[in-house]
């Protein structure tokens, strides 16, 4: 297969900004790059973007789709502390294996422990959470094995329960705050007040001291009977796996089971952990994974290039699970910096040889953040929202308190003003990472494919008619072409028509107009087309929404 030629300077600049920090470059950023004669300017730009605020904010939205992160969960659970914790890990560039280990071994409540938010995503559903965990971090297609031996994969129901037993000595609480709130409510303290105080404390992870998981009532295999206790056992993809250092963990001490599971999963010698995140990040940046789908990597021989997949996993391990460093390697490859290819038909994806990245539409978050750049400028990268203090202020040892102590604590919190309603910012100066996760169904982000966060990797790049109508007639296009938008103000400040046209093309497409485009646009402007109208036209072109 012949490699694609190198991408143009303009296409590569825009691609790097969208893939690394999740938005298009401003005209000033593009001008600065094009003006440089430094032969290392591409590598220098990659380094600059990878340490920027934009990188971690964009990485957060990508990670949120994968982890099914929500701002609010069941039983009035508020995940603001988890949200803050995730963003802090990205800010510190903490190694991926350490982040995952802490999420899997967390204890405490939503009010006291940020990483506890991961397991609390599925309260009272340990089997579902395990299936999601194995899929997200190991690419293991195990969900069917919850109920029976998997008909299309190698996993059995016995193996699934043996893995679930590592969580059998922990309780991820799904307690309903409404019952206790109803019992304690008075004229001085309403049921809603009490729910607000106790909900974050009732959502918690605790240790039971013993492994309590048993086989289900409908278990139908000869290995065990329904109701028999399950003995923890680690998954294996091959006969030699158990010789690996990753498997040398304690599977008997009930107080160490989750830690043993997390140690095994995140170990450099786990057969799938490094290659799974390597494959996911390759897809993020190239448009197609080396092995599709990313949720099913049980047999790496089915990858389009098994040797490449194994090598990428080795890079992640060599980088000590530094995802920023791993992506730096990807961005500096000739393959990434080549011209894009058209996405192959579904039946040909398994044989795609990656002559370059594939042409793809922006994600909903990339589109939103790029639009905010046009409206407000690059200052959006420095704006963040942090609601964790709304949650931590409710922390108290709920399980150790009597009903009277709970009531008095809630009454004191109300008197101190703690029960003031949390107002979530929705301004157009905010990036997608600073908004509610996910946004409401009628929001631009959801209409353009933002994940519902109900399923893993549920975001969509599919186009539809409502999207077209939003771009043509919605509030967003009005904001882009409004007189107080940064884009319009700067365009109108320029002296000549040539400068205005060049500025708008640079702002929307990170390139100058061709001679033909310039002539046609100037003719339209001479005939009465205004700068805002021209911005509307460019905003509605397919070129704006695609990553080339």
Language model features: what each stretch is:
Residues 475:
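Extended glycan-interaction surfaces of carbohydrate-active proteins
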Residues 63-67:
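Active-site segment of extracytoplasmic enzymes that catalyze sulfate/phosphate-ester chemistry
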Residues 58-61:
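Conserved AdoMet
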Residues 11-20, 467:
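Short, solvent-exposed alpha-helical surface patches in non-cytosolic proteins
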Residues 372-438, 443-472:
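Long, His/Glu/Asp-enriched segments that create or flank divalent metal/ion-associated functional microenvironments
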Residues 2-14, 24-54, 68-407, 454-459, ...:
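Primarily short, surface-exposed interaction patches in extracytoplasmic proteins
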């Amino acid at each position: 297969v012949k490699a694609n030629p190198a991408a143009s300077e303009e296409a590569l600049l825009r691609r790097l900004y969208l893939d690394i920090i999740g938005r298009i470059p401003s005209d000033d950023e593009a001008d600065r790059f094009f003006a440089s004669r430094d032969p290392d300017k591409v590598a220098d730009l990659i380094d600059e973007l990878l340490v920027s605020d934009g990188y971690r904010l964009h990485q957060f939205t990508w990670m949120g789709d994968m982890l099914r992160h929500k701002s609010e969960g069941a039983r009035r659970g508020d995940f603001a502390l988890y949200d803050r914790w995730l963003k802090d890990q990205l800010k510190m560039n903490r190694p991926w294996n350490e982040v995952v280990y802490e999420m899997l071994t967390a204890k405490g409540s939503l009010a006291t422990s940020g990483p506890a938010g991961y397991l609390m995503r599925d309260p009272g559903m340990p089997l579902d959470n395990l299936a999601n965990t194995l899929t997200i971090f190991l690419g293991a297609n195990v969900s069917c094995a919850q109920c029976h031996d998997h008909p299309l994969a190698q996993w059995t129901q016995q193996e699934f329960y043996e893995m679930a037993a590592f969580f059998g000595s922990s309780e991820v609480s799904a307690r309903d705050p409404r019952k206790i709130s109803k019992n304690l409510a008075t004229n001085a303290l309403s049921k809603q007040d009490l729910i607000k105080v106790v909900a974050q404390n009732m959502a918690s992870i605790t240790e039971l001291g013993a492994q309590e998981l048993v086989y289900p009532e409908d278990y139908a295999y000869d290995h065990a009977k329904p109701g028999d206790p399950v003995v923890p056992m680690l998954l294996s993809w091959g006969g030699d796996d158990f010789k690996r250092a990753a498997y040398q963990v304690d599977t008997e001490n009930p107080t160490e089971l989750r830690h043993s599971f997390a140690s095994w999963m995140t170990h450099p010698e786990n057969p799938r952990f490094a290659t799974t995140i390597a494959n996911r990040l390759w897809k993020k940046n190239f448009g197609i994974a080396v092995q599709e789908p990313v949720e099913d990597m049980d047999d790496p021989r089915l990858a389009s290039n098994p040797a490449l997949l194994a090598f990428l996993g080795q890079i992640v391990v060599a980088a000590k699970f530094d995802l920023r460093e791993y992506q730096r390697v990807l961005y500096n490859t000739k393959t990434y910096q080549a011209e894009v290819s058209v996405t192959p038909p579904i039946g040909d994806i398994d044989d795609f040889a990656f002559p370059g990245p594939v042409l793809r539409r922006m994600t909903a978050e990339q589109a939103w953040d790029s639009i905010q750049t046009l409206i407000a400028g690059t200052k959006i990268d420095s704006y963040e929202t942090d609601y964790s203090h709304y949650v931590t202020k409710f922390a108290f040892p709920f399980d150790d308190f009597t009903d009277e102590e709970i009531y008095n604590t809630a009454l004191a919190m109300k008197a101190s003003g703690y029960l003031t309603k949390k107002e979530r910012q929705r301004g157009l100066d905010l990036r997608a990472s600073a908004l509610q996760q996910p946004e409401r169904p009628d929001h631009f982000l959801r209409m353009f494919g933002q994940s519902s966060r109900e399923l893993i990797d549920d975001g969509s790049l599919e186009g539809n008619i409502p999207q077209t109508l939003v771009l043509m007639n919605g509030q967003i296009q009005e904001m882009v072409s409004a007189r107080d938008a940064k884009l319009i103000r700067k365009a109108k400040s320029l002296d000549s028509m040539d400068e205005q046209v060049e500025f708008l093309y640079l702002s929307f497409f990170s390139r100058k107009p061709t001679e033909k485009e310039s002539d046609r646009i100037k003719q339209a402007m001479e005939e009465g087309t205004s700068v805002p109208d021209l911005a509307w036209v460019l905003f509605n072109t397919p070129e704006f929404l695609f990553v080339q």
